[in-house]
Amino acid sequence: MAERVSDPPRVSVVVPFFDSGRHLRACIESLLALDARPGEVELIFVDNGSTDDSAAIAADFRGITVLHEATAGAYAARNTGIRVARAPIIAFTDADCIVDRDWVRAIIAGMTDPEVGALLGHCRYPDNASLPLRLLGAYENAKIAVVAGRCPPANRFAYCNNMAVRASIFDEIGPFREWRRAADSELVHRMGLNRPELKLVHDPAVRITHLEFTRARDRARRLRLYTETNAQIDGFRELNVSQRLAILWFWLRGGGR
């Protein structure tokens, strides 16, 4: 891990991108518009070998750091960002997401408790998203809330499009596995095994909008891939019936919206 220097920012934000020209500009603009004092947040974008106009789009902006990672894969790109990050909290989102203006403020507030090792946020979809997708999104948020708050490490999963981790966690247990998928889930699983006293929390105030999807069937197809790849995590267990019922009950009561 890179040595942490004095007077660091409070939060380092790491965003990998690969051929992300469709949404990258909106992502960068949302991060530059964050409610933050000068020097409080550093923005690190990592180009993972884009062949479209993504690099040119990123070059249009001042106030961000752009790095390059030749090893294919978003987790390799995230690890490159982690190595240079200077803040005690490292936050992650994706190039097809826009963050709320108070996103970093909510992350800082949510991680005030020193027992919180990692934080997962709330995901919305665009205004033109279908009703089934909005319902599916609410269910996924409810699922994250229940798993983070009530389930053991073996059941944990995470999404890097809205996630914050203490830098010390990477120093202690290592970076993301450079897998194609599920390394975010593996990281919080590994944190629970190595640092069981630390909490994984869900904070609905930490909000992003995921621009990639507008139809439920496309998102459901992606979720099936995540479910399949979670099986590569050593010791991972699928949710049991009682856990799934707890999620359903929480969702029916309005959780995740």
Residue map of PLM features:
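Glycine-rich, basic loop-to-helix element that forms the pyrophosphate-binding segment
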Residues: 69-85
